[in-house]
Amino acid sequence: MCTGGSNMGIINSNLTKLGSFLGNEKLYIPEYQRGYSWEETQLDDFWIDLLQIYEENVRDEHFFGQVVIHKNKEDGKRYIIDGQQRISTTIILLDILRTKFKEIADSTNNNDANDDSEDINAKYIGRISDSKKEQYLSMGGVDKEFFFEYVQKRGAIDYTDKKFD
C-alpha cells in the first residue's frame, strides 16, 4: 500500500468486476512508473488465466490480480500504483478484440460484430478522433505516445499473427 503526504488517499479495498473497473473513470499511469515490460512468459500466464476462466465457465467471479489505485486529492485523478502491466495488457487485448469485431463487421455486414466493436471502444478504450482524445487509460513516460498511437487509435496496429485468429 502507498504511504505519503496529505494528497494521498485510499479509495477502497474490494473486489470489482473488470468491466466496471475499466469503464468507471479514467485511469492514469504515473510518469515515474516503469514502462510496459511484459514479455512472453507474463503474456502466456495472462492468456492461460483467461483460458482457465473460459474452460471452467467461471463468469461471475475470478481473481484477475491486484490493482492498487491512488486517487490524488489535488487533481482528482486515479493513478495505477500497482497492476499497470495487467491493466495495460487487458486494454491491448480489448483493442485486438475491437479490431477483429470490426473486421468481421466490415467483411460480413454483421451489425452485432460492429456493435461489439463500438461497445468495446466506448466502454473500455475511449473515443479517439482528431477532435477528441477520451482514452480511459493514460500511460505515463515512454509508453504514452506509443500506446495512444498504436493501441488506442482505432485500427492502428495490424494484427496478422495467427495466434489471434
Explain the meaning of each model-derived region.
Residues 2-165:
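Glycine- and hydrophobic-rich flexible loops that cap the catalytic core of alpha/beta enzyme folds
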